[in-house]
Amino acid sequence: ARQAGYTGSITLSTLANLTHPASLLEAKRLGADRVVLPRELSIDEIHQMSDACPDGVVLECFIHGALCYCVSGRCYWSSYMGGKSGLRGRCVQPCRRVYQQGGNTIQTLFQKGQEALRGGDQQGRGRFAEKARSGRTRIPGERVGDTGDGRRLRPGGRFQTGRYFSCQDLSMDVLVKTLTGIPHLVSWKIEGRKKGPHYVYHTVTAYRILRDNPGDPEAKKTAEGILQMALGRPNTRARFLPQHTAVPVDPSGQTSSGLLVGKIGIDRQGAPFIKPFIPLLPKDYLRVGVEDENWHTTLPVTRFTPKGGTLLLRIPRHKTPKAGVCVYLIDRREKELTQILNEWQSRLECMPERTTENVTSRPNRVIPCRFTRLPDMVVHASLPQGKETRGARKFLSCLWVSSKSAAISHTVINRFGWWLPPVIWPDEEDQFRRLVLSLWRDGARSFVLNSPWQVGLFTTEMLDDEKASFTAGPFCNISNPATVNVLKDMGFTAAIVSPELGSRDFLELPRLSPLPLGMVLAGCWPVGMSRYGTLGVRLNEPFMSPKHEAFWARQYGENTWIYPAWQLNLSAH
């Protein structure tokens, strides 16, 4: 942004993944003015971030609105399922879909794998199937399917289905009083970029009342009533209260936004209608069903319909819903709200127009580095045994940094590369700082950091060591030379690009990069990771999407990692 001539304030969003206190200091060094905190933080962790926040940087935190199941900036689910990157704001929301687990799920997975093998698919989903085929899938209790870390997937247990990853809306409501007076926290954030004026007006009004009247019980009651009229989803406080953390999903419930106003009926001519539970006004906006149903659609109300009256719905014949489908009110233009909008529109039209100027500055030229051959890396999910602890000539064996991996023999630590996790939470920072220091003292000099801000865990002396290598890992989501140039200035010596890049970008970026680059060639790459845990989904057991794509979940530390049941493999390319 600065290279393009922008001189205003720079805000780092939740996609930047600043999840631990040291990250704020690094953001300050890069010139950031404002940081949006992750939604997964508790009130105690928000205080930790505030205490560590340097002068010149202010904080924002979310208080209301939609929740993503996966950690922001660490979700690739939409890319896997829809070919559209959630990191670029084009998420197709696969987490909102109905998934099933148990019963014949594992058998279906096995059959799909066999079909893929017969069709010659040896690179994508067939790779998993080839491993699954070697297992005995029909024997109860037998472990089937390699998870990539020495464990195997369990066969299906009882059959179940639900929206296991579709989060309710975050709502701090009366608890926002605990956020007042926190140093550096200057802004409350309401998620609602795709919402209508009704939602925006009601949520903002409610939280303004709560902010201005923190100890007034009548104001509290009024604000709660206004929030109930905002037409959002069922709400949750998620992890905000550390003593009452909750998994913010209701697998058996409806987690789409809107107020239930009726159910579909079908008249004698086959036309759909509803008898609304509340009066409907002209310009109200309705949603029929939920997003992953074939008949899902949205439509306006064209005339006033009293409670219990009949409203015929003009829906294309190919989208005619079945009787009993729920209908929701998702937006409303009350007379008073329309008047307010008109007043603001008039004020906007009276304001003088700003003159715009062309940007005259040019981005700094990035000087490409000379070709440098770096060793291939093989990242192990489990601790090496026997001969695996010996140094390899053709590649660098790597381990994820953890208390368990750091406890291996001191004599072999320097033979491995050490990968830091994609997410470090505030209560984990001190632990990882100690682990990094311990590994360094035992001779470790090759580190892969899966967030740029993790350089804050290393001392200046470490970063200046000529024998050390610091690689920006694939979870840094690197996609252009300008980003690589910033990483070089931060002290990185190499980088691994984002797996989301297309083939053209993969081939073009190394020619322009100021650092040696790598890419993820093969392995179990997650669709996402979450701090919320699972409710209903059993770990290490396959579950399936509506189109029978198979996945499985595994717990690592505080986070649940979700993997597709096929390995990424670009070896042939």
Predicted regions and their residues:
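Active-site pocket-lining/capping segments in soluble small-molecule metabolic enzymes
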Residues: 1-22, 36-187, 194-486, 490-573
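Long, basic N-terminal domains or extensions that often function
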Residues: 33
